[in-house]
Amino acid sequence: MAVAYADKPNHFINFPLTQFEGFVLNYKGLQFQLLDEGVDCKIQTAPHISLAMLDIQPEDYRSVDVAIQEVIDDMHWGEGFQIKFDNPLILGRCIVLDVKGVEELHDDLVNYIRDKGCVADQSRKWIGHCTIAQLTDAALSIKENVDFINSMQFNYKITINPSSPARLEIVKLGAEKKDGFYETIVSHWMGIRFEYNPPTDKLAMIMGYCCLEVVRKELEEGDLPENDDDAWFKLSYHYENNSWFFRHVYRKSSYFRKSCQNLDCNCLGFYESPVEED
């Protein structure tokens, strides 16, 4: 089956960098050097890494949202990982920093999003980078500008661990920027989410069940639609959109997860009441 590529993207997975103050201080230092040298360019005001380009519609947001959460919950942190930013270079019309350390994250995001049936990544090879500025056509044609950019020095590392402020976001191309960040559709903290308290007692009661009849007995009358397919869909909605429910069902009850996804009971009669003998 041919792979569909986002060669005409309309969204991207964003890794914002504004919250890393030490990096931003050095990043802005590079931008100041460009302006001080008189290089005609448009400065990037929302430093970030584009981890994957997407060709999706609003009805795909939920699927991509869940894929991002699955990537985060499947991460093997250890002591964390480092993102390394190296000397500026010219990529197309942009002045960018070379970025290393997020290749595996890029691959995971693309694979998980594609598994949801959504279009991710482009046919050309993905190159990790962080844009500093965009050159005008006139500036790009001036040899002195190119020589100056190639002479600029930059070397910085960010350590990403469960307590760092790293986030993964869905951003629409052309989204507004404010205070160094893009307007987002979805934004998730990447840290390990140690939350063991259910948001409601009802979700706590049904977590782990894979029989709709038993779920209905645990909940109050009217909590679920009478139609079985509609009831499973409601449970699936909670599974995909409630982070506590998602994490605990994902980790502790594969049967319930499959039931939600298939809108069907997987209990095989195991939850039926035993017949009392005379």
Swiss-Prot record:
Q: Which Gene3D superfamilies match?
A: Cyclic phosphodiesterase (3.90.1140.10)
Pfam families, A to Z: Corona_NS2A
Q: Which domain of life is it from?
A: Viruses
| Signal peptide region | none
Family, per entry = Belongs to the coronaviruses ns2a protein family.
- The protein in question is named Non-structural protein 2a
* Organism the protein comes from: Bovine coronavirus (strain Mebus)
Q: Taxonomically, what lineage is the organism? A: Viruses, Riboviria, Orthornavirae, Pisuviricota, Pisoniviricetes
